[in-house]
UniProtKB/Swiss-Prot annotation:
Present with 1900 molecules/cell in log phase SD medium. This is Centromere DNA-binding protein complex CBF3 subunit B. GO terms for biological process: kinetochore assembly; mitotic spindle assembly checkpoint signaling; septin ring assembly. Acts as a component of the centromere DNA-binding protein complex CBF3, which is essential for chromosome segregation and movement of centromeres along microtubules. CBF3 is required for the recruitment of other kinetochore complexes to CEN DNA. It plays a role in the attachment of chromosomes to the spindle and binds selectively to a highly conserved DNA sequence called CDEIII, found in centromers and in several promoters. It is found in: Nucleus; Chromosome, Centromere. Signal peptide: none annotated.
Amino acid sequence: MFNRTTQLKSKHPCSVCTRRKVKCDRMIPCGNCRKRGQDSECMKSTKLITASSSKEYLPDLLLFWQNYEYWITNIGLYKTKQRDLTRTPANLDTDTEECMFWMNYLQKDQSFQLMNFAMENLGALYFGSIGDISELYLRVEQYWDRRADKNHSVDGKYWDALIWSVFTMCIYYMPVEKLAEIFSVYPLHEYLGSNKRLNWEDGMQLVMCQNFARCSLFQLKQCDFMAHPDIRLVQAYLILATTTFPYDEPLLANSLLTQCIHTFKNFHVDDFRPLLNDDPVESIAKVTLGRIFYRLCGCDYLQSGPRKPIALHTEVSSLLQHAAYLQDLPNVDVYREENSTEVLYWKIISLDRDLDQYLNKSSKPPLKTLDAIRRELDIFQYKVDSLEEDFRSNNSRFQKFIALFQISTVSWKLFKMYLIYYDTADSLLKVIHYSKVIISLIVNNFHAKSEFFNRHPMVMQTITRVVSFISFYQIFVESAAVKQLLVDLTELTANLPTIFGSKLDKLVYLTERLSKLKLLWDKVQLLDSGDSFYHPVFKILQNDIKIIELKNDEMFSLIKGLGSLVPLNKLRQESLLEEEDENNTEPSDFRTIVEEFQSEYNISDILS
């Protein structure tokens, strides 16, 4: 299943070559026997110079991890949701009634308290998406006037949807203690049909956040946004995307994002370069549109996958094609600050894109590409360290945290790739170092009473990548440093914000599953065929990818209408895997171990 990186050699010529009186290269199997198809006889007659070691199969395993990381920790956990065409159709009257409950639950004074929280703490998340943030208070006032007068228009509903997206963001990030000061939980008892007294720590904050997001989307539907497009659709979506909405509802989020891209291009606002003949209003508008564009590109990249074939971020070329090499030119200040934090965030994310493109590729990243990314990260680290930070302002501190966390994440991925593709001397030490940096950034937020910073979706995604890779690596390599790091990561995962909901539970399940694979690895002996290695753990990991790939193959659902023209196995994804298993030549006890583990720890349980 995994090949040797170096072919083994025997102490003496094989018996086949000795009998034939020909020169033997002493490889296992030797070249003569491979040509004559006598591999098995050759291998039986030889004695190995060295026993199997991790150095023989680890390079192949680490290359395999790239594919595993893409399909399991990225696509499977965050971007796959099974369509249920058998469920009861949506009842529009019920949807309206439920949304009206939550809209009536929010009172006027509470809405202004939410807006105050957004202004004082969450500016780094949405200021760039709004032209004039001071206008939001006026829009909230007008929202309540419209509700009192029952005077509605599409324009008003767009503002309502935008305002409710801000409310949703506030509910998501607000500390539970502050939420309890503003809202009473008792009106929700009857609505949710609960027999026990609820409090905000019982998952009620997540329920409230999800329903506030529904209210924002409900008002967008009332705008008939596909027939009457408006830039406020894009703004509302970008604000919702600062929560876990894109990962809770990946199919819906992808559809909305595609419509946002269409709307953005429909108004020809993707050309926001300043011109000499621009009047002051146009200049201000172009600045805002530029910020929206880069935020939209960031969302577009982070949601990219097999279920989202339409992309915007690909229209922006790699930073390495131009900016990375400007440092070799005279009179170029590579440390000059970007025009906005949105541009800074995008440039860092684009380096992440340059690395992650190799997750699902068989090609190897050139060493000069990795070195160029390393130089760029050093430049961005200097820029972020130089950012003015007002320690009294949560907006300023949150802005810097996001940038530092992004740089640390990309740095971790960079040295992981040095380890996988080039096994450089310091690569593992650097992976451990940046893992600790990421942990410290999160822990520092607890100490600084800024725990809500850790609710940013990027925190969950990064921890998923880090803890999964370290868990995987620890299966095959005994290292005290790696083992201790895994203990720290496991403890950190247990203390991540509960607002991450089911995704956090599924991450815990995935890490526990990898720890069970470690036990299986220690329990079952590795089979060595001379040129390949076999072990139930290898087979299980390979099957994991096949299962998630099949779950993302929509062809079976698109051909249902063809009836008897379609083979039955095409309508059952699982049968494709079963047919392949029937053709395997592994011993029966080997297959039994694999099947029992997959039955007890089904990888499909990480899916939504």
